[in-house]
From Swiss-Prot:
GO terms for molecular function: rRNA binding; structural constituent of ribosome. This is Large ribosomal subunit protein uL6. The gene is rplF. GO terms for cellular component: cytosolic large ribosomal subunit. The lineage of its organism: Bacteria, Bacillati, Bacillota, Bacilli, Bacillales. Disulfide bonds: none annotated. InterPro entries: Ribosomal_uL6-like, Ribosomal_uL6-like_a/b-dom_sf, Ribosomal_uL6_a/b-dom, Ribosomal_uL6_bac-type, Ribosomal_uL6_CS.
């Protein structure tokens, strides 16, 4: 059995989960998420727990078992606690600022780069060099943080660029002279 799939999902008291066939809606204090999950999986919902049950031990069902459980658990965690990704801007003159709900990055290009805020996603800037991406969908938060990082990924010679907080950037030595 899948190690991830067989774990039971605990539901906090302030979160409600409703199933309509294979479509699930999760409501909590931070918002509401809905998604269509794998139609082969079944869900056993008790008072404050949900168990994902697979129909057979075929390879396809085994792989989808853990994925379905992880997606459902991420939705429950998102509406109850939310997700945060923190990015750091490293480099001389690199800075971030808010313009309404959107994020403006000055990262060494001839023009500022504007990142639009998506639905259920908020940005916050601390000390002009630290950007927080917050939201209820783990998938959206991670994708938007990755898009921001891809504007100027950290380079290996000086370490300049946009990196995740705590990310290790492998450094290289420059060319040696004659």
């Amino acid at each position: 059995m899948s190690r991830v799939g067989k774990k039971i999902i605990d539901i906090p008291s302030d979160v409600t989960v409703t199933f309509d066939g294979n479509h699930v809606t999760v409501k909590g204090p931070k918002g509401e998420l809905s998604r269509t999950l794998n139609e082969r999986m079944t869900f056993k919902q008790e008072e404050n727990t949900i168990e994902v049950v697979r129909p057979s031990d075929s390879k396809e069902d085994r792989t989808n078992h853990g994925t379905t459980r992880a997606l459902l658990n991420n939705m429950v965690q998102g509406v109850s606690q939310g997700y945060v990704k923190v990015l750091e801007l490293v480099g001389v003159g690199y800075r971030a600022q808010m313009q309404g709900k959107d994020l403006i990055l000055n990262v060494g290009y001839s023009h500022p780069v504007e990142i639009k805020a998506e639905e259920n996603i908020t940005f916050s800037v601390e000390k002009n060099t630290v950007v927080k991406v917050e939201g209820i969908s783990k998938e959206q938060v991670g994708a938007l943080a990755s898009n921001i990082r891809s504007v100027r990924p950290p380079e290996p010679y000086k370490g300049k660029g946009i990196r995740y907080q705590g990310e290790y950037v492998r450094r290289k030595e420059g060319k040696t002279g004659k």
